[in-house]
Amino acid sequence: GERDSVIRVNMTDTLFRMQLPFVPSRVLPNTDGRGYGVFVPDEPALHWLAAHWWEIEDDTARQSLLMGLYENYLAKHISADDWVNSLITGLPAEKNALVASTASGYLANVMREIAPANRAEVEARIYTMTQNHPLPSCRIQLMRLFMQNAISEPMVKKLYILWQQQSDKHLNRQDYTTLAYELAIRMPLESEQILRTQRARIDDPDRLRQFDFISRAAVSDTARLDTLFNSLLAAENRRIEPWTTAVIRYLNHPLREDQSVKYIRPGLEVLEEVQCTGDIFFPKNWAAALLGNHLSSSAYEEVV
Protein backbone atom coordinates (compact mmCIF):
# COMPACT_ATOMS: atom_id res chain seq x y z
CA GLY A 1 0.00 0.00 0.00
CA GLU A 2 0.90 3.66 -0.20
CA ARG A 3 2.46 5.60 2.64
CA ASP A 4 3.69 9.16 3.00
CA SER A 5 7.41 9.85 3.16
CA VAL A 6 8.85 13.23 4.12
CA ILE A 7 12.24 14.01 2.60
CA ARG A 8 14.09 17.15 3.68
CA VAL A 9 16.43 18.76 1.18
CA ASN A 10 18.65 21.83 1.30
CA MET A 11 17.80 23.73 -1.87
CA THR A 12 20.34 26.33 -2.89
CA ASP A 13 19.21 26.65 -6.52
CA THR A 14 16.00 26.59 -8.52
CA LEU A 15 16.57 22.94 -9.48
CA PHE A 16 17.44 20.05 -7.17
CA ARG A 17 17.98 16.45 -8.31
CA MET A 18 18.01 13.40 -6.06
CA GLN A 19 17.69 9.64 -6.33
CA LEU A 20 14.78 7.96 -4.57
CA PRO A 21 14.78 4.32 -3.43
CA PHE A 22 11.14 4.00 -4.56
CA VAL A 23 8.81 5.23 -7.29
CA PRO A 24 6.61 8.02 -5.89
CA SER A 25 2.97 8.30 -6.89
CA ARG A 26 3.22 12.06 -6.40
CA VAL A 27 5.65 14.64 -5.01
CA LEU A 28 4.12 17.39 -2.87
CA PRO A 29 6.60 20.21 -2.20
CA ASN A 30 7.00 22.30 0.95
CA THR A 31 4.53 20.42 3.14
CA ASP A 32 5.97 21.99 6.30
CA GLY A 33 5.70 25.54 4.96
CA ARG A 34 9.34 26.36 5.65
CA GLY A 35 10.34 26.90 2.05
CA TYR A 36 10.22 30.33 0.45
CA GLY A 37 9.15 30.88 -3.12
CA VAL A 38 6.77 29.37 -5.66
CA PHE A 39 6.88 25.58 -5.67
CA VAL A 40 5.52 24.12 -8.90
CA PRO A 41 4.56 20.42 -8.68
CA ASP A 42 4.39 18.34 -11.83
CA GLU A 43 1.02 18.36 -13.57
CA PRO A 44 -0.36 15.10 -12.10
CA ALA A 45 0.57 16.18 -8.56
CA LEU A 46 -0.92 19.63 -9.11
CA HIS A 47 -4.21 18.15 -10.33
CA TRP A 48 -4.27 15.72 -7.42
CA LEU A 49 -3.69 18.53 -4.94
CA ALA A 50 -6.49 20.63 -6.40
CA ALA A 51 -8.85 17.67 -6.08
CA HIS A 52 -7.74 16.40 -2.67
CA TRP A 53 -6.05 19.13 -0.55
CA TRP A 54 -8.80 18.94 2.08
CA GLU A 55 -8.11 15.24 2.65
CA ILE A 56 -4.60 15.89 4.00
CA GLU A 57 -4.80 15.23 7.75
CA ASP A 58 -1.95 17.39 9.03
CA ASP A 59 -3.14 20.98 9.51
CA THR A 60 0.24 22.55 8.77
CA ALA A 61 0.71 20.53 5.58
CA ARG A 62 -2.83 21.29 4.46
CA GLN A 63 -2.35 25.03 5.02
CA SER A 64 1.04 25.06 3.29
CA LEU A 65 -0.17 23.09 0.28
CA LEU A 66 -3.25 25.30 -0.01
CA MET A 67 -0.97 28.34 -0.09
CA GLY A 68 1.11 26.58 -2.74
CA LEU A 69 -1.98 25.99 -4.85
CA TYR A 70 -2.83 29.68 -4.63
CA GLU A 71 0.67 30.59 -5.81
CA ASN A 72 0.23 28.23 -8.74
CA TYR A 73 -3.12 29.81 -9.57
CA LEU A 74 -1.45 33.24 -9.60
CA ALA A 75 1.25 31.80 -11.87
CA LYS A 76 -1.50 30.62 -14.29
CA HIS A 77 -0.81 26.93 -13.70
CA ILE A 78 -4.42 26.48 -12.51
CA SER A 79 -7.41 28.06 -14.21
CA ALA A 80 -9.71 30.34 -12.23
CA ASP A 81 -12.66 27.97 -12.61
CA ASP A 82 -10.63 24.93 -11.50
CA TRP A 83 -9.29 26.90 -8.53
CA VAL A 84 -12.76 28.04 -7.46
CA ASN A 85 -14.10 24.52 -7.80
CA SER A 86 -11.25 23.24 -5.65
CA LEU A 87 -11.96 25.80 -2.94
CA ILE A 88 -15.72 25.38 -2.78
CA THR A 89 -15.39 21.59 -2.83
CA GLY A 90 -12.87 21.43 -0.01
CA LEU A 91 -14.02 24.31 2.17
CA PRO A 92 -17.27 22.73 3.48
CA ALA A 93 -15.26 19.98 5.17
CA GLU A 94 -12.59 22.26 6.66
CA LYS A 95 -12.68 22.36 10.47
CA ASN A 96 -9.46 24.27 11.14
CA ALA A 97 -10.32 27.96 11.52
CA LEU A 98 -7.03 29.24 10.06
CA VAL A 99 -7.16 27.00 7.00
CA ALA A 100 -10.85 27.84 6.47
CA SER A 101 -10.09 31.55 6.71
CA THR A 102 -7.25 31.20 4.20
CA ALA A 103 -9.44 29.31 1.73
CA SER A 104 -12.25 31.86 2.11
CA GLY A 105 -9.83 34.70 1.45
CA TYR A 106 -8.57 33.00 -1.69
CA LEU A 107 -12.17 32.53 -2.81
CA ALA A 108 -12.80 36.27 -2.48
CA ASN A 109 -9.78 37.04 -4.65
CA VAL A 110 -10.88 34.88 -7.58
CA MET A 111 -14.63 35.57 -7.80
CA ARG A 112 -14.42 38.01 -10.70
CA GLU A 113 -12.34 35.60 -12.77
CA ILE A 114 -15.04 32.93 -12.90
CA ALA A 115 -16.61 32.16 -16.27
CA PRO A 116 -20.06 33.82 -16.44
CA ALA A 117 -21.74 30.47 -17.16
CA ASN A 118 -20.48 29.10 -13.83
CA ARG A 119 -21.09 32.17 -11.70
CA ALA A 120 -24.64 31.42 -10.49
CA GLU A 121 -23.74 27.90 -9.36
CA VAL A 122 -20.65 29.12 -7.50
CA GLU A 123 -22.67 31.81 -5.73
CA ALA A 124 -25.32 29.27 -4.73
CA ARG A 125 -22.69 26.94 -3.26
CA ILE A 126 -21.10 29.80 -1.33
CA TYR A 127 -24.51 30.79 0.02
CA THR A 128 -25.08 27.22 1.20
CA MET A 129 -21.80 27.38 3.12
CA THR A 130 -22.87 30.67 4.76
CA GLN A 131 -25.78 28.75 6.24
CA ASN A 132 -24.25 25.44 7.28
CA HIS A 133 -20.46 25.59 7.53
CA PRO A 134 -19.39 24.03 10.86
CA LEU A 135 -17.25 27.06 11.83
CA PRO A 136 -19.19 30.23 12.79
CA SER A 137 -16.16 32.39 11.95
CA CYS A 138 -16.08 30.91 8.45
CA ARG A 139 -19.81 31.46 7.98
CA ILE A 140 -19.36 35.15 8.81
CA GLN A 141 -16.35 35.53 6.51
CA LEU A 142 -18.18 33.80 3.67
CA MET A 143 -21.29 35.92 4.19
CA ARG A 144 -19.21 39.10 3.96
CA LEU A 145 -17.59 37.74 0.80
CA PHE A 146 -21.03 36.83 -0.54
CA MET A 147 -22.43 40.30 0.21
CA GLN A 148 -19.67 41.93 -1.83
CA ASN A 149 -19.67 39.53 -4.77
CA ALA A 150 -23.14 38.08 -5.41
CA ILE A 151 -24.65 39.29 -8.68
CA SER A 152 -27.05 36.54 -9.80
CA GLU A 153 -30.68 37.54 -9.39
CA PRO A 154 -31.71 34.74 -6.98
CA MET A 155 -28.76 35.44 -4.69
CA VAL A 156 -29.27 39.21 -4.72
CA LYS A 157 -32.88 38.54 -3.75
CA LYS A 158 -31.69 36.46 -0.80
CA LEU A 159 -29.42 39.31 0.27
CA TYR A 160 -32.28 41.79 0.02
CA ILE A 161 -34.46 39.63 2.27
CA LEU A 162 -31.57 39.23 4.71
CA TRP A 163 -31.09 42.99 4.81
CA GLN A 164 -34.82 43.68 5.21
CA GLN A 165 -35.21 41.24 8.09
CA GLN A 166 -31.71 41.65 9.56
CA SER A 167 -32.01 37.94 10.21
CA ASP A 168 -28.36 36.90 10.49
CA LYS A 169 -27.42 37.56 14.11
CA HIS A 170 -23.75 36.97 13.39
CA LEU A 171 -23.63 40.17 11.32
CA ASN A 172 -23.17 43.50 13.08
CA ARG A 173 -24.71 46.90 12.37
CA GLN A 174 -21.86 47.92 10.09
CA ASP A 175 -22.33 44.72 8.07
CA TYR A 176 -25.95 45.64 7.40
CA THR A 177 -24.94 49.16 6.42
CA THR A 178 -22.37 47.75 4.00
CA LEU A 179 -25.02 45.41 2.64
CA ALA A 180 -27.32 48.40 2.07
CA TYR A 181 -24.61 50.07 -0.04
CA GLU A 182 -24.10 46.89 -2.06
CA LEU A 183 -27.82 46.38 -2.61
CA ALA A 184 -28.33 50.00 -3.64
CA ILE A 185 -25.71 49.54 -6.36
CA ARG A 186 -27.20 46.21 -7.50
CA MET A 187 -30.81 47.44 -7.41
CA PRO A 188 -30.72 50.96 -8.89
CA LEU A 189 -34.50 51.31 -9.05
CA GLU A 190 -34.73 50.69 -5.30
CA SER A 191 -31.52 52.46 -4.28
CA GLU A 192 -33.14 55.55 -2.78
CA GLN A 193 -35.57 53.46 -0.72
CA ILE A 194 -32.82 51.12 0.49
CA LEU A 195 -30.57 53.98 1.58
CA ARG A 196 -33.44 55.85 3.20
CA THR A 197 -34.47 52.77 5.19
CA GLN A 198 -30.91 52.06 6.30
CA ARG A 199 -30.39 55.66 7.38
CA ALA A 200 -33.47 55.46 9.60
CA ARG A 201 -31.92 52.46 11.40
CA ILE A 202 -28.85 54.43 12.49
CA ASP A 203 -29.10 56.31 15.79
CA ASP A 204 -25.44 57.04 16.54
CA PRO A 205 -24.54 60.60 15.35
CA ASP A 206 -21.02 59.67 14.23
CA ARG A 207 -22.23 56.64 12.29
CA LEU A 208 -24.92 58.81 10.74
CA ARG A 209 -22.31 61.30 9.53
CA GLN A 210 -20.31 58.45 8.08
CA PHE A 211 -23.39 57.03 6.35
CA ASP A 212 -24.34 60.40 4.87
CA PHE A 213 -20.82 60.80 3.49
CA ILE A 214 -20.43 57.31 2.00
CA SER A 215 -24.00 56.61 0.87
CA ARG A 216 -23.69 59.32 -1.78
CA ALA A 217 -21.59 56.82 -3.74
CA ALA A 218 -24.36 54.20 -3.73
CA VAL A 219 -27.03 56.20 -5.59
CA SER A 220 -27.92 55.35 -9.18
CA ASP A 221 -27.79 58.88 -10.67
CA THR A 222 -24.57 59.02 -12.71
CA ALA A 223 -24.56 62.83 -12.76
CA ARG A 224 -24.56 62.88 -8.95
CA LEU A 225 -21.79 60.30 -8.91
CA ASP A 226 -19.67 62.38 -11.28
CA THR A 227 -20.22 65.47 -9.13
CA LEU A 228 -19.26 63.50 -6.03
CA PHE A 229 -16.03 62.24 -7.60
CA ASN A 230 -15.05 65.69 -8.80
CA SER A 231 -15.65 67.11 -5.33
CA LEU A 232 -13.10 64.69 -3.87
CA LEU A 233 -10.38 66.13 -6.07
CA ALA A 234 -10.40 69.10 -3.68
CA ALA A 235 -8.47 68.43 -0.46
CA GLU A 236 -11.07 70.03 1.81
CA ASN A 237 -13.64 67.42 0.74
CA ARG A 238 -11.54 64.38 1.63
CA ARG A 239 -10.44 65.19 5.16
CA ILE A 240 -11.79 61.96 6.67
CA GLU A 241 -9.63 59.60 4.67
CA PRO A 242 -11.20 56.19 5.46
CA TRP A 243 -14.60 57.53 4.42
CA THR A 244 -13.12 59.02 1.26
CA THR A 245 -11.45 55.72 0.41
CA ALA A 246 -14.81 53.95 0.79
CA VAL A 247 -16.48 56.47 -1.53
CA ILE A 248 -13.78 56.02 -4.19
CA ARG A 249 -14.15 52.25 -3.92
CA TYR A 250 -17.93 52.37 -4.39
CA LEU A 251 -17.61 54.83 -7.27
CA ASN A 252 -15.31 52.26 -8.91
CA HIS A 253 -17.42 49.27 -7.91
CA PRO A 254 -17.01 46.19 -10.17
CA LEU A 255 -20.60 46.58 -11.39
CA ARG A 256 -19.76 50.14 -12.47
CA GLU A 257 -16.53 49.32 -14.24
CA ASP A 258 -17.57 50.71 -17.62
CA GLN A 259 -18.89 54.01 -16.31
CA SER A 260 -16.06 54.61 -13.83
CA VAL A 261 -13.09 54.31 -16.20
CA LYS A 262 -13.34 58.09 -16.66
CA TYR A 263 -12.38 58.57 -13.00
CA ILE A 264 -9.00 56.87 -13.34
CA ARG A 265 -6.90 59.52 -15.03
CA PRO A 266 -8.08 62.53 -12.95
CA GLY A 267 -7.82 60.35 -9.85
CA LEU A 268 -4.20 59.54 -10.65
CA GLU A 269 -3.37 63.11 -11.63
CA VAL A 270 -4.31 64.31 -8.15
CA LEU A 271 -2.35 61.52 -6.43
CA GLU A 272 0.69 63.70 -5.71
CA GLU A 273 -1.55 66.25 -4.00
CA VAL A 274 -3.22 63.44 -2.06
CA GLN A 275 0.24 62.43 -0.88
CA CYS A 276 1.06 65.95 0.26
CA THR A 277 -2.23 66.62 2.05
CA GLY A 278 -3.01 63.24 3.59
CA ASP A 279 -1.79 60.52 5.91
CA ILE A 280 1.23 58.46 4.84
CA PHE A 281 -1.01 55.50 3.89
CA PHE A 282 -3.71 57.52 2.14
CA PRO A 283 -2.11 57.63 -1.35
CA LYS A 284 -1.86 53.84 -1.45
CA ASN A 285 -5.44 53.44 -0.23
CA TRP A 286 -6.66 56.05 -2.73
CA ALA A 287 -4.92 54.30 -5.63
CA ALA A 288 -6.12 50.86 -4.55
CA ALA A 289 -9.72 52.06 -4.28
CA LEU A 290 -9.44 53.81 -7.64
CA LEU A 291 -7.85 50.94 -9.58
CA GLY A 292 -8.49 47.74 -7.65
CA ASN A 293 -11.79 46.82 -9.30
CA HIS A 294 -10.77 47.58 -12.89
CA LEU A 295 -9.84 44.73 -15.22
CA SER A 296 -10.66 46.16 -18.65
CA SER A 297 -8.28 47.11 -21.44
CA SER A 298 -9.74 50.63 -21.44
CA ALA A 299 -8.75 50.98 -17.78
CA TYR A 300 -5.26 49.74 -18.63
CA GLU A 301 -4.96 52.41 -21.30
CA GLU A 302 -5.70 55.07 -18.70
CA VAL A 303 -2.65 54.18 -16.62
CA VAL A 304 0.00 53.52 -19.28
Residue positions per predicted region:
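Solvent-exposed serine/threonine-rich low-complexity stretches and specific carbohydrate-binding patches
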Residues: 6-10
